[in-house]
Design a protein with these regions (language model features):
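Q-loop/switch helix immediately C-terminal to the Walker
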Residues: 46-61
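Conserved ABC nucleotide-binding domain
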Residues: 74-90
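Hydrophobic anchor residue at the start of the ABC signature
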Residues: 102
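H-loop/switch region of ABC-family ATPase nucleotide-binding domains
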Residues: 149-150
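A short, surface-exposed alpha-helical micro-motif characterized by mixed small hydrophobic
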Residues: 155-157
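Conserved beta-strand-loop-alpha-helix hinge in the C-terminal portion
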Residues: 169-193
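ABC ATPase nucleotide-binding domains
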Residues: 187-234
């Protein structure tokens, strides 16, 4: 498959692979494509939050007046308040800084955003909140969002598709449920981490209990309850 095939799909796509699998080379190729906004620690160029958000549109001579409505829309969507705009980027929390990085790139209106292992120093609560914000960005701004991560369990609930990298190549790409349902043994053979929730559903199936494909613990509890209720009512 071509790298271009994963772009402009209006999906959230997870990119995973073992250490040394060649993730970085594949990600580098993605970054070279057109209309890619890259979110990483190199994004920060200014001390003041508002200046940072407007840095790239100034750098590339966008007309700020025409972008004011868009800036307000993005700031509102990302829940960046007025007080935060006047602060130093070095005095805000890591999760707030992450939102500032997104806003500064989003203002340039790229079609695709790539998050290159920047989410995962956050605690669980902050990470979950920000991943939910990415789902809103995808929906309301029609963006393709690519998340490179070391741990599939961190993002499984929030992604639509998955890319699995092995030996410097794209081993598998497609809908997350189909990838794990149709390629479970291959992924195991490659010793690539499988989401805990997928492992649980597979073990239940191996023991004769078929559960719906779900991607979060709340839905798993519901589907287990439905199945067990049916079982005990027989």
């Amino acid at each position: 498959m071509r790298i271009e095939d994963i772009l402009n799909t209006n999906k959230i796509i997870g990119v995973i692979g073992n250490s040394g699998s060649g993730k970085s080379s594949i990600v580098s190729k993605i970054k070279q494509c057109k209309k890619i906004g890259i979110i990483n620690s190199d994004v920060i160029k200014c001390d003041n939050v508002k200046d940072q958000i407007e840095y790239y549109v100034r750098e590339y001579n966008y007309r700020l007046k025409e972008l004011q409505d868009r800036e307000n829309e993005i700031i509102t969507m990302l829940e960046i308040d007025e007080e935060l705009l006047e602060r130093s980027v070095y005095s805000i929390s890591e999760s707030e800084l992450f939102k500032v990085m997104i806003a500064s790139i989003m203002l340039c209106n790229p079609d695709n955003l790539i998050f290159d292992e920047v989410l995962f120093s956050l605690d669980y609560k902050a990470k979950t909140k920000l991943l939910k914000l990415l789902m809103k960005l995808k929906k309301f701004f029609n963006k393709t969002i690519i998340i490179v991560c070391p741990n599939i369990d961190d993002i499984y609930e929030f992604i639509d598709d998955i890319i699995i990298i092995d030996e410097g190549k794209i081993l598998l790409y497609g809908n997350k449920y189909e990838i794990y349902s149709n390629n479970y043994d291959l992924i195991k053979e490659k010793n690539i981490r499988i989401p805990i929730i997928v492992e649980f559903i597979k073990k239940m199936k191996d023991n004769g209990i078929n559960l719906d494909n779900v991607d979060n613990i709340n839905e798993l509890i519901k589907t287990v309850y439905r199945e067990m209720r049916w079982y005990f009512e027989i």
